[in-house]
Design a protein with these regions (language model features):
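C-terminal ends and interior cores of transmembrane alpha-helices
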Residues: 86-100
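C-terminal membrane-cytosol helix-exit motif in multi-pass small-molecule transporters
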Residues: 158-167, 188-211
Length: 279
């Protein structure tokens, strides 16, 4: 294999990691962030109920982060990433039916498993493999910057789809019409997530598939050893603090609707711009 073909293959792997790294959270997070007023209305939720859904997701995700790393040491990242995208997309089909609050709680717990346990450790491992021994910083900077670009692009497409399927002016639409338009946004998002998993399964080919599996007990002992390092806990605090600040921006579209009295489409555009500013 020539050096040029290896370089192209490596670049393709990075692009696929960037796509999957953001699209995996499109259904559980990005839609609620961009379309917050519409989201609450079509699912008949209040802010407390939406927060409880995220809490269910967070509890499952917290456990998944710990044990997901063990799974990523045992199986090829390519397969884990693809499977997690497939399962997450299947949840989107249920999401599009506007299920009851109880089913939504189960669904968000399910997404906490599919987007973290099967995915996160595998994505981090695949990114480290791409970066090699000398380009770890470059690899993760490309990953995070690229994810921001994907979020901005997908939120713009989502707003466009929502506006396209609104048959009349937003002020004149009924709840059922807004639900139908938003259903297309959910189904499109589910399709994109599934299709990305399909591409990754067949196109992401590299040395990650030849990595030998690690004994589970060895991985768990390494986790325990790592948790004894003080700097690891400081990094945890930094990351949590950064995400707390980041999550505050989720209410911008709702603020635009309830305080500035923007309509649902204008509020969604505020949410879209918020994703763009994350770049």
């Amino acid at each position: 294999m020539t050096h040029q073909s290896i370089k192209k293959k490596s670049f393709l792997n990075l692009v696929l990691l960037i796509l999957s790294g953001e699209l995996i959270f499109l259904l559980p997070y990005v839609l609620a962030r961009v379309f917050r007023p519409t989201f609450l209305e079509v699912f008949d939720l209040n802010n407390f109920e939406l927060g409880s859904l995220f809490s269910v997701y967070g509890i499952v995700a917290l456990l998944s982060y710990v044990y997901g790393g063990v799974i990523s040491d045992k199986y090829p990242p390519r397969k884990l990433i693809a499977i997690s995208l497939f399962f997450t997309a299947f949840g989107g089909v249920v999401f599009a039916t506007y299920p009851s609050f109880l089913v939504l709680q189960i669904l968000y717990g399910y997404w906490g498993f599919t987007t973290v346990f099967l995915f996160w450790g595998a994505m981090i491992k695949a990114t480290r493999i791409w970066g090699g021994t000398n380009s770890q910083g470059q690899a993760f900077s490309f990953l995070d910057g690229g994810r921001g670009l994907v979020a901005a692009s997908m939120s713009s497409i989502g707003v466009l789809i929502f506006s396209f399927f609104l048959v009349t002016e937003i002020e004149l639409t009924t709840l059922s019409q807004r639900k139908e338009a938003f259903r297309y946004v959910i189904l499109f998002s589910s399709f994109i997530v599934f299709f990305t998993g399909f591409i990754i399964l067949f196109l992401m080919k590299n040395k990650e598939d030849t990595v030998q599996t690690t004994n589970n007990f060895s991985s768990i002992s390494q986790i325990k050893k790592t948790l004894k390092i003080p700097s690891v806990w400081l990094i945890m605090i930094i990351i949590v603090s950064a995400y707390v600040g980041y999550k505050v921006t989720d209410i911008y579209s709702l603020y635009a609707s309830e305080v500035m009295l923007f309509d649902d489409l204008e509020s969604a555009n505020i949410g879209r711009c918020n994703c763009t500013l994350d770049l």
